[in-house]
From Swiss-Prot:
SUPFAM superfamilies reported for this sequence: Ribosome-binding factor A, RbfA (SSF89919)
Assembly notes: Monomer. Binds 30S ribosomal subunits, but not 50S ribosomal subunits or 70S ribosomes.
Phylogenetic placement of the source organism: Bacteria, Bacillati, Bacillota, Bacilli, Bacillales
Major place of residence: cytoplasm
Protein name, entry field: Ribosome-binding factor A
Protein's organism: Listeria welshimeri serovar 6b (strain ATCC 35897 / DSM 20650 / CCUG 15529 / CIP 8149 / NCTC 11857 / SLCC 5334 / V8)
């Protein structure tokens, strides 16, 4: 990723966090944290990684709410970030936090057994 794509990625991460927590009023939207944004070098596509707190059903409902609000989110990003064309976004669940918590739990169990 080039320098400009990195800057756009960081700015999108910040703005998406604000949009998801303050602007979208969908009750299906759970507690969402934007953990990262990968933007292609030509700034045409962005993969948004999110962490969702809750059960599998709540995660599914949150993804449905994000899919429904996709157009609104893109228009808000377009207003906040000066780009010729707003990247096409796809949302993916980031399981790295849950994976890290599981490893910590296993390590604590190993230490308590000794």
């Amino acid at each position: 990723m080039n320098v400009r794509a990195n800057r756009v990625s960081e700015q999108m991460k910040k703005e998406l966090g604000d949009i998801l927590n303050r602007k979208i009023k969908d009750p299906r939207l759970g507690f969402v944290t934007v953990t990262g944004v990968d933007v292609t070098g030509d700034l045409q596509e962005a993969k948004v990684f999110i962490s969702i707190l809750g059960t599998d059903k709540e995660k599914e409902n949150t993804l449905l709410a994000l899919a429904k609000a996709h157009g609104f989110i893109r228009s808000e990003i377009g207003r906040r970030i000066r780009l010729r064309k707003v990247p096409e976004m796809s949302f993916e669940i980031d399981n790295s936090i849950a994976y890290g918590n599981r490893i910590d739990e296993l390590l604590r169990d190993l230490n308590s057994d000794q």
